[in-house]
Amino acid sequence: MAAGPLRGLAVAGGGESSDSEDDGWEIGYLDRKSQKLKGPLPVEERQETFKKALTTGNISLVEELLDSGISVDTSFQYGWTSLMYAASVSNVELVRVLLDRGANASFDKDKQTVLITACSARGSEEKILKCIELLLSRNADPNVACRRLMTPIMYAARDGHPQVVALLVAHGAEVNTQDENGYTALTWAARQGHKNVVLKLLELGANKMIQTKDGKTPSEIAKRNKHLEIFNFLSLTLNPLEGKLHQLTKEESICKLLRTDSDKEKDHIFSSYTAFGDLEIFLHGLGLEHMTDLLKEREITLRHLLTMRKDELAKNGITSRDQQKIMAALKELEVEEIKFGELPEVAKLEISGDEFLNFLLKLNKQCGHLITAVQNIITELPVNSHKIVLEWASPRNFTSVCEELVSNVEDLSEEVCKLKDLIQKLQNERENDPTHIPLMEEVSTWNSRILKRTAITVCGFGFLLFICKLAFQRK
């Protein structure tokens, strides 16, 4: 193999920042035109030549230098070994040669292992997978964490590699371990928006209810990062995928998870997981994948499916068993309606503090659902406006309704602010009353927090409706 220039620098895997990002690997050419060593070299020059042979991928020269006596685990500047560098650029052949020459697959520098470096490499999943297979075959531990307590499976999930995730689990990687911030592999996949990895982790037994240190579940992390498909999928209580592959033996897992279609092109061997749309994600979560073709044939979208009644489902050829699954899921997704008639009359002074607080919590929750619905429309409308049949009604009608909504939300916001001021006034009067016994600080703080949150939510909903109105006006 001819020597060539280095195209990029090797950086520490896992996003760890340090003053050693180049790790002593300089851009340049081999000084010697020949791939053969013409004679013995001094130790320092021999190490420099070894480093340049690694950066250019000159395997024949690497082997010759190893034959001349240089150690395969030679540490270069900042402590990286030749195997760590080869893994960081997903050079499969170089990794194989170094391992065959006795390189330590379990080496780590400041808890940065070779396996972590390989999992966080910038390369195709095919090359990364092959490098990791080689390292695991030499007993690299898939559960050793870095300084931030991130394990290899977390890096693979973060970077969107479902096949790598599956391989690591098949070799004993813990699915639900947490890093220093409480993130699991599933949390990382949800945060980055990798749907295929999320589905694979759920099959492998990932627990979607594990919370981060700030109390967020993977679904909430997905929502915060605007990955609404993943949020909707993870929000479903029913999860037929969970643990589907968990009881398989190691050999069965590897065989099942890495099986590919031999008729596919080589470049697509490791891309067997296609991107799912909204409808596919919903059906997959309910174990109703077999309905996908039927619904697409009848041109039934997810939004249409979510509005269908039981008799409509039956007319479209959906079996009673599948109907039950769909109706149960729809019930979970319904926005809880506030029954204002059940609220005791304030004028009769029969309302309790708990009932009033419960009312505010329900109101706040419903506003949150409405905000999410409007956000979905704002997200989809500019990109998929061709899917909305505007011919059914004039766009001016939509704008007019939006204006009324904004006006109503402004009125609601004004009334909530009045309510907040009134409660604050009553609270101040009670505190100044010498006969009043003050409540615990935590209770008043919590009530105040609920009121503030409700007011902010209502104001935010009004702002979103205003943006929605502008979007319709542009159309």
Curated annotation (Swiss-Prot):
Gene Ontology cellular-component terms listed: pi-body
UniProt keyword Cell inner membrane, yes or no: no
Stretches the record annotates as Disordered: 1-25
Protein keywords: ANK repeat, Cytoplasm, Developmental protein, Differentiation, Meiosis, Phosphoprotein, Repeat, RNA-mediated gene silencing, Spermatogenesis
Residue stretches in coiled coil: none
Positions carrying Phosphoserine: 17-18, 20
PROSITE patterns: ANK_REP_REGION, ANK_REPEAT
Pfam families: Ank_2, Ank_4, SAM_2
Transmembrane regions: none
CDD domains named among the record's database cross-references: SAM_ASZ1 (cd09521)
Domain SAM: start-end pairs: 272-334
Domain of life: Eukaryota
ANK repeat ranges, renumbered to this chain: 45-74, 78-107, 110-144, 148-177, 181-210, 214-243
A biological process term (GO) from this entry: male meiotic nuclear division
InterPro entries: Ankyrin_rpt, Ankyrin_rpt-contain_sf, Asz1_SAM, SAM, SAM/pointed_sf
Compartment(s) where it occurs, according to its Swiss-Prot or TrEMBL record: Cytoplasm
Keyword rRNA processing: no
Subunit details: Interacts with DDX4, PIWIL1, RANBP9 and TDRD1.
Role noted for this protein: Plays a central role during spermatogenesis by repressing transposable elements and preventing their mobilization, which is essential for the germline integrity. Acts via the piRNA metabolic process, which mediates the repression of transposable elements during meiosis by forming complexes composed of piRNAs and Piwi proteins and governs the methylation and subsequent repression of transposons. Its association with pi-bodies suggests a participation in the primary piRNAs metabolic process.
Protein name (Swiss-Prot/TrEMBL): Ankyrin repeat, SAM and basic leucine zipper domain-containing protein 1
Gene that specifies this protein: ASZ1
